[in-house]
């Protein structure tokens, strides 16, 4: 008998750290967690701090915190002042010079929440990639989550980078998001943009597919028992399926004349439709960022002002957008001190 005596191979610090990060625990950490957890903690902490204590009086001329009497709908972490341009507004930067109160007054919390929020969303998507690889499944969950990631990046980073300053990005609040939507309609005619139309079709189509799918599966569950509650009609660990794909196929074949023939096509379609419903408007927002004038009538209005022979249809859509611009220019950008004479204010045909 031969006995070999030797040293166990030395493990480097990287291997030790890799094992610790990927250890099976209640809340998985992983390499993605090094990005996700700190940035998500700071983004949420910044948002709760801003909505609770920080005013928007110096940036937007409004109250925006619970301390000032706002509620959940009206509280927000507002964008920085227009004069700040695209500065990162670092706490130690030339604007705030290390003064935390001054930093909050200038809107530094918005850039803090936006940048940390962006990295936390990317970290969450990477987390889904990492866990999918470890458990041996395909990474389509991460692919689906790319939808919210690109929507966030398009609205909160790319759009204001194409505009004059961070001021024109959405603030982090409920009413603030609706203000941003109104702004997109009035200044970009967003609802006429085909990328917005594709987004509506994708999101509403995805919701419809989700409802139809859930109802169809419930309708075709095998009746494994006499219990009225469907959850008591099957064993969560059973090998066989609990519903009939054949029956579902027969039902929809009778309804539409066509039906999905297998679950792969069905579930790929349920993945594709809503994800495209998030990617397409994100592409459209990039177009708005650089002020593409294809669908907003402004180019027609400019030509009509220069060329008396050029005719345009003055529709209710144009009236709506002019009204939004006349209202929001004054109320939304008080630092510009806009004053519009009566003769340029939009009026309907009845006035």
From Swiss-Prot:
Single GO BP term: photosynthetic electron transport in photosystem II
Reactions catalysed according to its record: 2 a plastoquinone + 4 hnu + 2 H2O = 2 a plastoquinol + O2
Positions contributing to a plastoquinone binding: 213, 260
SUPFAM superfamilies, alphabetized: Bacterial photosystem II reaction centre, L and M subunits (SSF81483)
Major localization class: membrane
Binding locations of chlorophyll a PD2: 196
InterPro entries xrefs: D1/D2, Photo_II_D1/D2_sf, Photo_RC_L/M, Photo_RC_L/M_CS, PSII_PsbD/D2
Location in or out of the cell: Cellular thylakoid membrane
Alphabetical UniProt keywords: Chlorophyll, Chromophore, Electron transport, Iron, Magnesium, Membrane, Metal-binding, Oxidoreductase, Photosynthesis, Photosystem II, Thylakoid, Transmembrane, Transmembrane helix, Transport
Bilayer-spanning residue ranges: 39-59, 123-139, 151-164, 206-226, 277-293
A GO CC annotation given for this chain: photosystem II
An annotated Gene Ontology molecular function: oxygen evolving activity
Family: Belongs to the reaction center PufL/M/PsbA/D family.
Subunit structure, interactors included: PSII is composed of 1 copy each of membrane proteins PsbA, PsbB, PsbC, PsbD, PsbE, PsbF, PsbH, PsbI, PsbJ, PsbK, PsbL, PsbM, PsbT, PsbX, PsbY, Psb30/Ycf12, peripheral proteins PsbO, CyanoQ (PsbQ), PsbU, PsbV and a large number of cofactors. It forms dimeric complexes.
Function, as annotated: Photosystem II (PSII) is a light-driven water:plastoquinone oxidoreductase that uses light energy to abstract electrons from H(2)O, generating O(2) and a proton gradient subsequently used for ATP formation. It consists of a core antenna complex that captures photons, and an electron transfer chain that converts photonic excitation into a charge separation. The D1/D2 (PsbA/PsbD) reaction center heterodimer binds P680, the primary electron donor of PSII as well as several subsequent electron acceptors. D2 is needed for assembly of a stable PSII complex.
Protein name per Swiss-Prot or TrEMBL: Photosystem II D2 protein
Organism (species): Prochlorococcus marinus (strain MIT 9313)
